[in-house]
Regions:
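Extended, charged helical/alpha-beta scaffold domains that provide interaction surfaces
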Residues: 1-168
Length: 168
């Protein structure tokens, strides 16, 4: 499932950015981890507890992945029909791609127009353009993933309100 892979990617990225392999569990950067993860996946904030003593980075990553998947499965259970949530996933993903892609095209145009200034800095404009374009593309892909997962976790089903007919 695409959304499940995206969730795993987000957890891996957040843990990879915030947690060092060679640091003890009680000294991990929990604030940074929460700042990266919680705006996208609404888990409980991660804090050090005694049962985490001796925990490895991979263990934390696995624990957070399991919690995030469990939370998403609970969100799926809110939908009466599984096909409806799959359709919603497709629509949300397409909208995120469309939005990020149009922004990316605009950003690439601005990069193309401004890249000539790199020659003044004694740098090869073509090399700088390729490096910047790659970074921007990577940022776009990450943004698509984050937007899609954030929206899917925060989506709610609205039940149609049944009204009694007004007596004439």
């Amino acid at each position: 499932d695409t959304i499940m892979r995206m969730i795993n990617d987000i957890v891996e990225h957040a843990v990879g950015m915030a947690i060092s392999e060679d640091v003890d569990a009680k000294d991990w950067a929990y604030t940074e981890l929460n700042e990266l993860l919680l705006p996208i996946i609404p888990l409980q904030p991660v804090r050090y507890t005694e049962d985490m003593k001796g925990m490895k980075k991979a263990d934390l990553m696995q624990k957070l992945k399991e919690e995030a998947i469990k939370l998403y499965e609970a969100k799926e259970a809110e939908f009466p029909d599984l096909e409806k949530i799959r359709e919603l996933e497709r629509v949300v993903l397409l909208k995120a791609i469309d939005n990020r892609w149009t922004n990316h095209i605009d950003d690439m145009e601005q990069l193309r127009q401004g890249i000539g200034l790199q020659a003044y800095g004694q740098r090869d404009p073509l090399v700088e353009y390729k490096m910047s374009a790659y970074d921007m593309f990577d940022e776009m892909i990450t943004g698509i993933t984050e937007d899609t997962v954030r929206i899917m976790y925060h989506v709610r089903i609205e039940q149609p309100v049944e009204r009694e007919p007004v007596v004439k």
